[in-house]
Amino acid sequence: MLLAQVNRDTQGMEFQSVDGDPQQVTLCLTEAVTVADDNIDGMDTVSLQAVTLVDGSTAYIQHSPKVSLTENKIMEGQVIQLEDGSAAYVQHLPMSKTGGEGLRLEDGQAVQLEDGTTAYIHAPKETYDQGGLQAVQLEDGTTAYIQHMPQSNTILAIQADGTVADLQTEGTIDAETISVLEQYSTKMEATECGTGLIGRGDSDGVHMQIVLQGQDCRSPRIQHVGEKAFRCEHEGCGKLYTTAHHLKVHERSHTGDKPYICDHLGCGKKFATGYGLKSHVRTHTGEKPYRCQELNCLKSFKTSGDLQKHTRTHTGEKPFKCPFEGCGRSFTTSNIRKVHIRTHTGERPYYCAEPNCGRAFASATNYKNHMRIHTGEKPYVCTVPGCDKRFTEYSSLYKHHVVHTPCKPYNCNHCGKTYKQISTLAMHKRTAHNDTEPIEEEQEGYFEPPAEAIDDPGLMYTPSVVDDDSGSEQVSGSEIMGQHHVALISQDGTQQVLSQADMQAMGGTITMVTQEGTTITIPAHEAMLSSGGAHSVTMVSADGTEGQVAIVTPDLAAYQTEEGELIQDQEQHEVSTSPHPVTLLATSNGTHIAVQLSDHPSLEEAIRIASRIQQGETPGMDD
């Protein structure tokens, strides 16, 4: 235990070491302890050592700061001649917590520090004044409050072990002890450390810092309430934060330190913050405490941030604007904006290291999804009983969920019609309202992926390049309101409409690679799009086998079987040639079931109806 006594009348200071070998202590007047006493104009830096006299009393030897401490080193057991002629010897004094022997802390104020140590502030209690509290910023960055007493003595004691509760049970703390430990709120003034000089603030009194000899003396920080006074010293950074804690968390982004580890069996992921770990644990527990309050939405999320981003899909709020002049686009999240900005700069910082690949990506999510093409990994599985479909992308899984739900989250702002997929909405707006305004990918928020799986809004599909992240694809052709379209429909249900000009640019055929590695080729000539009697399409498999796929017209039966073994398991192909769209489903046993829909086609609705037909049911067209 270290006891420091300050006598303000004489400016003298006394330190006593009672928990180990006698040690020298230096009082360095700098930053952390604030004492509002305008009568103190200066204070000398001194070094003191406790000695025990032969009669059992204790004396203190003061060393002049102008003399080297090593020249006055006093060892335990050494006999010292005092000024009055008596002899004294240096002796270790044990600290007794139970009273009787040693020093007892009477009438003290307890301060629990962040590093586990306990500080006690003692003063005569007969002049206790609630309004006399002064803020104390400790060396570890914490803030405590002490009461300044106008009497001649104030004692600050720091005990290396023990807690406040220990002393309370022993009856050593007075009932009038002040409760402390508030957050940072004191205004500090920078002073030179180690000079022994006292720095005076504008109105805050004297600033002091107690430094044990041998410790480094750090430059103090200046903090004003509400200001960002903590600066990151990492080269090229310089970000400011309001508290030392926030700065410490930020610095982990430079050091890579992740002290929070998931203890779930087989996981072991690490995180830089406790909040990040807490959010991650919910992926194991399934807890989603943050629920959307929008009527008929029913979505829940693991974090408040995910809920906030999802809510913007209802409100249309896009607070994050692109800073590039002439762009004018805005986004629901800062991360989407960051990825979008790379479409202006051309930056693609994520490179595939696989041999003979060399692809680069603007977002980490697309990079991770691409790498699964090389590894074959499909970690995201549909949990609906009997489905068990797997996907390389988290977002693809959530978009797939519309197959199993009646929800239609995407609505037309012109007529109010609702759709399950944003691609279907886009086609409706182009054909029915001549609205060619692109629909932002970030609006696909109903099944919104978590923050680490946000799709790259800058990822563009081109007519001549098919994104190889999609696994397998299907083709649809439709004639709506006199306009011809061909749509590439990926396995997860997303759809990209191609014009005839796009088709011509692609050449004579459309070749698709399924997730099993087989190839399906479909002719892309104009005759395919004609409504005048083209009721079948030739499909060619990888081994050269050809087969005719029938197109069911409105006056035919609800389904029709056509021979052929070229269709792969669970592949869906949509072909429409009449003003009343028809959807063709290829089942796992090679049976082709065509379902006519009364409204604009939806691949998911067709699959649902066709599945019921395959099971022997005869659902109506409005099912």
Swiss-Prot record:
<keyword id="KW-0677">Repeat</keyword>
<keyword id="KW-0862">Zinc</keyword>
<dbReference type="GO" id="GO:0000981">
    <property type="term" value="F:DNA-binding transcription factor activity, RNA polymerase II-specific"/>
</dbReference>
<dbReference type="GO" id="GO:0008270">
    <property type="term" value="F:zinc ion binding"/>
</dbReference>
<comment type="function">
    <text>Transcriptional activator. Activates the gene for selenocysteine tRNA (tRNAsec). Binds to the activator element (AE) motif of the selenocysteine tRNA gene promoter.</text>
</comment>
<comment type="similarity">
    <text>Belongs to the GLI C2H2-type zinc-finger protein family.</text>
</comment>
<keyword id="KW-0539">Nucleus</keyword>
<protein>
    <recommendedName>
        <fullName>Zinc finger protein 143</fullName>
    </recommendedName>
</protein>
<dbReference type="InterPro" id="IPR013087">
    <property type="entry name" value="Znf_C2H2_type"/>
</dbReference>
<dbReference type="InterPro" id="IPR036236">
    <property type="entry name" value="Znf_C2H2_sf"/>
</dbReference>
<dbReference type="Pfam" id="PF00096">
    <property type="entry name" value="zf-C2H2"/>
</dbReference>
<dbReference type="GO" id="GO:0000978">
    <property type="term" value="F:RNA polymerase II cis-regulatory region sequence-specific DNA binding"/>
</dbReference>
<keyword id="KW-0863">Zinc-finger</keyword>
<feature type="zinc finger region" description="C2H2-type 5">
    <location>
        <begin position="350"/>
        <end position="374"/>
    </location>
</feature>
<feature type="zinc finger region" description="C2H2-type 7">
    <location>
        <begin position="410"/>
        <end position="433"/>
    </location>
</feature>
<dbReference type="GO" id="GO:0061035">
    <property type="term" value="P:regulation of cartilage development"/>
</dbReference>
<feature type="zinc finger region" description="C2H2-type 4">
    <location>
        <begin position="320"/>
        <end position="344"/>
    </location>
</feature>
<dbReference type="GO" id="GO:0045893">
    <property type="term" value="P:positive regulation of DNA-templated transcription"/>
</dbReference>
<dbReference type="GO" id="GO:0005634">
    <property type="term" value="C:nucleus"/>
</dbReference>
<feature type="zinc finger region" description="C2H2-type 3">
    <location>
        <begin position="290"/>
        <end position="314"/>
    </location>
</feature>
<keyword id="KW-0804">Transcription</keyword>
<keyword id="KW-0805">Transcription regulation</keyword>
<keyword id="KW-0479">Metal-binding</keyword>
<feature type="zinc finger region" description="C2H2-type 2">
    <location>
        <begin position="260"/>
        <end position="284"/>
    </location>
</feature>
<keyword id="KW-0010">Activator</keyword>
<dbReference type="GO" id="GO:0006357">
    <property type="term" value="P:regulation of transcription by RNA polymerase II"/>
</dbReference>
<feature type="zinc finger region" description="C2H2-type 6">
    <location>
        <begin position="380"/>
        <end position="404"/>
    </location>
</feature>
<feature type="zinc finger region" description="C2H2-type 1">
    <location>
        <begin position="230"/>
        <end position="254"/>
    </location>
</feature>
<keyword id="KW-0238">DNA-binding</keyword>
